[in-house]
Amino acid sequence: MIQQYILGTAASVSAISSKNGCSALTVNEQLIGLDEFGQTEPFGYCGNIVPLSTSDKISSMCKELAERIVLNFGLVGSNGVDFVVSDDGVPYVIEVNPRFQGSLECVENVLGLNMVEAHVKACRRGLLPKVRNAISKFCTRLILFAPRRSVVPDLRRRAEVRDIPVPGVVIEKGEPICSIIAEEKDRDSSFRKAEGLAQKILGSLKPV
């Protein structure tokens, strides 16, 4: 199979749909192939930043495409559509994910919305959530991977750390260690906050 390689920004749309309609909630930036956080795959998923920092035009295009795709396939509940937004601002559809997405926590944080509750209401009662148009903060979810075979310390006291392994467990090289959630008023500050904690955690690993 030959596929065209599109230079641009990895993105996604998080949507809630019922049998009668679809509401695209957020356009999200996807973090892909970040080897500084232990990800060894060039296209490996490393988390999200919500929302995607882009123009209203591009955001609207992505949301409209996602809604059309979800409705065309008759999907119900929480669904995601992945894109690459090319350097000249054209969104290319990559795949459809008829499930909860890795961006769930960040979408909940920036919208103040319970995504599981919204999913159930859409599936059982056909109700779509009402969300605010203006988003006043950015949320980063950063997934850390073991750069080498390591023993993980106790991470339970860090409120920003999620998906926490048992203290003292051995994590193999390239396997996920944990997720970090960081909120700030702008995109770069949110990412830097997550990045700073990530470096502290990576520095606390004990090679074995």
Question: Regions from the language model: what does each represent?
Answer:
Residues Q3, L75-D88, V131, V151:
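A short glycine-rich, hydrophobically flanked beta-strand micro-motif that places a catalytic Asp/Glu
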